[in-house]
């Protein structure tokens, strides 16, 4: 019998990432875990619908036995079984992030006995989670270099707080993992601005694009009007394609916040990324830790290692026989498998 791993949910950033990473790793390694103080660092601690959906999805995919899987629970015991490929559908029942649920279960399906399709309904444009286009255009091309073949499709947008969005991913078992080397970003090839609108006046998008164009030379400017019943909602994104990597940044519009202020937030974030020669942005860095650990080799550079990143590394090191090294030089941190 494999040993039970005990995790403190208040560790590091004290959010849901600890739980999501633990679920992924438990499914992959077969190691059971118990976690207490779930989301202790949040205003509403314990399991929300999004986290509960991730737990139930993980349990279904590997036939796990679970204790504490209920809304508001701050303690969970997860004993995994065998991961099975198949066609899965999960509903969050709120505007909780579809992509974070997918992020939890897809790594385990890399080790399944056959191809899988996972469909999740809930929120697709959430201010605290990566949108589907980030997964599709940024993360998945990098995963392909590592040897992971999955394809995400956004079937319907769902903005906060209404939700109602649908995201699906098709994934195949991984034959072998390759080393990912992302030390240098390289020169910028082009930048693309994009705005999504659903039930929001078009002039909002035009003002957001104008704000982006006032700070960057945009090779493309796209405005997409979605059906009104998928809103109301507004997301503005800026994609930076460089020689070695494509990064994508986004801000979700809010009520009573002007288009100019929303776009200015995005401008600030992109300028912070471009001010450093590091290849990887803060959000992407979190998502590369697990696949890199499974490969057992690789490295990337990031300007500032976030609390999210450090917490994720700590959880991975509890489940897998790997150690990460972080070396800071001239304001750039190189993250690698030692």
Swiss-Prot record:
The active site is at 308 (tele-amp-histidine intermediate). It is an enzyme of class 6 (ligase). One of its GO terms (biological process) is RNA processing. It comes from the Bacteria. Its EC number is 6.5.1.4. It is found in: Cytoplasm. It catalyses: a 3'-end 3'-phospho-ribonucleotide-RNA + ATP = a 3'-end 2',3'-cyclophospho-ribonucleotide-RNA + AMP + diphosphate. Keywords: ATP-binding, Cytoplasm, Ligase, Nucleotide-binding. GO terms for molecular function: ATP binding; RNA-3'-phosphate cyclase activity. Coiled coil: none annotated. Its main location: cytoplasm. Pfam families: RTC, RTC_insert. One of its GO terms (cellular component) is cytoplasm. Catalyzes the conversion of 3'-phosphate to a 2',3'-cyclic phosphodiester at the end of RNA. The mechanism of action of the enzyme occurs in 3 steps: (A) adenylation of the enzyme by ATP; (B) transfer of adenylate to an RNA-N3'P to produce RNA-N3'PP5'A; (C) and attack of the adjacent 2'-hydroxyl on the 3'-phosphorus in the diester linkage to produce the cyclic end product. The biological role of this enzyme is unknown but it is likely to function in some aspects of cellular RNA processing. Belongs to the RNA 3'-terminal cyclase family. Type 1 subfamily. PROSITE patterns: RTC. This is RNA 3'-terminal phosphate cyclase. It comes from Escherichia coli O1:K1 / APEC. ATP binds at residues 103, 283-287. The keyword Ligase applies. InterPro entries: RNA3'-term_phos_cycl_insert (IPR013791), RNA3'_phos_cyclase_dom (IPR023797), RNA3'_phos_cyclase_dom_sf (IPR037136), RNA3'_term_phos_cyc (IPR000228), RNA3'_term_phos_cyc_type_1 (IPR017770), RNA3'_term_phos_cycl-like_CS (IPR020719), RNA3'P_cycl/enolpyr_Trfase_a/b (IPR013792), RPTC_insert (IPR036553).
């Amino acid at each position: 019998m494999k040993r039970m791993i005990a995790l403190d949910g208040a560790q590091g950033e004290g959010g849901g990432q600890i739980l999501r990473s633990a679920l992924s790793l438990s499914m992959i390694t077969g190691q059971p875990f118990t976690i207490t103080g779930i989301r202790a660092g949040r205003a509403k601690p314990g399991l929300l619908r999004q986290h509960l959906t991730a737990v139930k999805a993980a349990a279904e995919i590997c036939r796990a036995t679970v204790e504490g899987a209920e809304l508001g629970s701050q303690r969970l015991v997860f004993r995994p079984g065998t991961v099975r490929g198949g066609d899965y559908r999960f509903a969050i029942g709120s505007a909780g992030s579809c992509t974070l649920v997918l992020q939890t279960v897809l790594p385990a399906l890399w080790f399944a006995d056959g191809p899988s399709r996972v469909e999740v309904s809930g929120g697709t444009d959430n201010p605290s989670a990566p949108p589907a286009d980030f997964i599709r255009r940024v993360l998945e091309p990098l995963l392909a270099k590592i040897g992971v073949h999955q394809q995400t499709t956004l079937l319907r947008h769902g903005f906060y707080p209404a939700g109602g969005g649908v995201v699906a991913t098709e994934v195949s078992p991984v034959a072998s993992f390759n080393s990912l080397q992302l030390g240098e970003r390289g020169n910028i090839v082009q930048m693309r601005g994009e705005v999504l609108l659903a039930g929001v006046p078009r002039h909002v998008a035009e003002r957001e694009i104008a704000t982006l164009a006032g700070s960057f030379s945009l090779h493309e400017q796209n405005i997409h009007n979605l059906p009104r019943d998928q809103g109301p909602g507004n997301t503005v994104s800026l994609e930076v394609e460089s020689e070695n990597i494509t990064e994508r940044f986004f801000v979700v519009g809010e009520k009573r916040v002007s288009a100019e202020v929303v776009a200015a937030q995005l401008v600030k974030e992109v300028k912070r990324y471009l001010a450093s020669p590091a290849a990887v942005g803060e959000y992407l860095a979190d998502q590369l830790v697990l696949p890199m650990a499974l490969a057992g080799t690789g490295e990337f550079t990031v300007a500032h290692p976030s609390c999210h990143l450090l917490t994720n590394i700590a959880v991975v090191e509890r489940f897998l026989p790997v150690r990460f090294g972080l070396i800071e030089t001239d304001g750039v941190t190189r993250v690698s498998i030692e």
